[in-house]
């Protein structure tokens, strides 16, 4: 019964792992709901400031802030939002594939690349893959603060403002629903015009700007970029927990199937051992 004992030991080990993955699935469900609440709470601000920026830009068509000016691209920057922890399926890998594909397209045009990496997994990936990481931050926790991001984002904004970076992208995972997380690459700078926005007619906008719209535009553009990065971090957190929940559920289900298969093998081995013992007893009795 040596084989049966080994199988029994494997079954016990897998059951122990199954309990862990099942517990992690339940924890991920709870954290995902909290992350969804944070995402929903921050979204109205991000959308509203986008509208305000659009209206300010429309109110001053002759004024072009440096963040809104197109120029020849010699160096691009990426703000990459990854996770701090693993065990979330292919969430990070799928994101890195989208990023590397875009980086390669720029490299083929002899354009240099700078990276600002948010999340430990991104930092670890680019340490082995290679890349000019000019800013990095990790260990943001379950409730990230926009104040934690300002320093790293400022490095990239200063680079664009001073002409070291000619285009800036934000790379993160969008939370579509519990089953779907989509890696996306959006251009942050220069600020592209919102083609879907309708022109504002006089009397339809309920704000008065003091001292004037131009000065507000200068101040709000930085806040706008920071809010977009923060929204991406919060949304990426919800996507992470959803992906982890799915990964742990799949692991738990696979463990159950493996236990069933091993249980069948164990029963067959035990049956074969009992049959052999009976045959030996019958053979011994016949010899006597």
UniProtKB/Swiss-Prot annotation:
It comes from Stutzerimonas stutzeri (strain A1501). CDD domains: F1-ATPase_gamma. The keyword Cell division does not apply. GO terms for molecular function: ATP binding; proton-transporting ATP synthase activity, rotational mechanism. Pfam families: ATP-synt. This is ATP synthase gamma chain. It comes from the Bacteria. PANTHER family: ATP SYNTHASE GAMMA CHAIN (PTHR11693), ATP SYNTHASE SUBUNIT GAMMA, MITOCHONDRIAL (PTHR11693:SF22).
């Amino acid at each position: 019964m040596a084989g049966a004992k080994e199988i029994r030991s494997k079954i016990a080990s897998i059951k122990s792992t199954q309990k862990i993955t099942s517990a992690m699935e339940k924890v991920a469900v709870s954290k995902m709901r909290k992350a969804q609440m944070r995402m929903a709470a921050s979204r109205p601000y991000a959308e509203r400031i986008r509208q305000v920026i659009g209206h300010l830009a429309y109110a001053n068509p002759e004024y072009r802030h440096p963040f809104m000016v197109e120029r020849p691209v010699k160096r691009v920057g990426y703000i990459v939002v990854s996770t701090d922890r693993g065990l979330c399926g292919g969430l990070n890998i799928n994101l890195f594939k989208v990023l590397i594909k875009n980086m390669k397209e720029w490299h083929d045009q002899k354009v240099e690349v700078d990276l600002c990496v948010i999340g430990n997994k991104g930092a670890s990936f680019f340490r082995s893959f290679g890349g000019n990481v000019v800013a990095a931050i990790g260990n943001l926790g379950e409730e990230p603060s926009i104040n934690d991001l300002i320093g790293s984002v400022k490095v990239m904004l200063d680079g664009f403002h001073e002409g070291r970076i000619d285009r800036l992208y934000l790379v993160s995972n969008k939370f579509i629903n519990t089953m779907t997380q989509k890696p996306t690459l959006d251009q942050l700078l220069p600020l592209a015009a919102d083609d879907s926005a309708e022109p504002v007619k006089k009397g339809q906008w309920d704000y008065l700007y003091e001292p004037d719209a131009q000065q507000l535009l200068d101040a709000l553009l930085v806040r706008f970029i920071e809010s977009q990065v923060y929204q991406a971090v919060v949304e990426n957190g919800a996507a992470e927990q959803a992906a982890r929940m799915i990964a742990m559920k799949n692991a738990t289900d696979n463990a159950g199937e493996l236990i069933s298969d091993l249980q069948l093998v164990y029963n067959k081995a035990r049956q074969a051992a009992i049959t052999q013992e009976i045959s030996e007893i019958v053979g011994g009795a016949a010899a006597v």
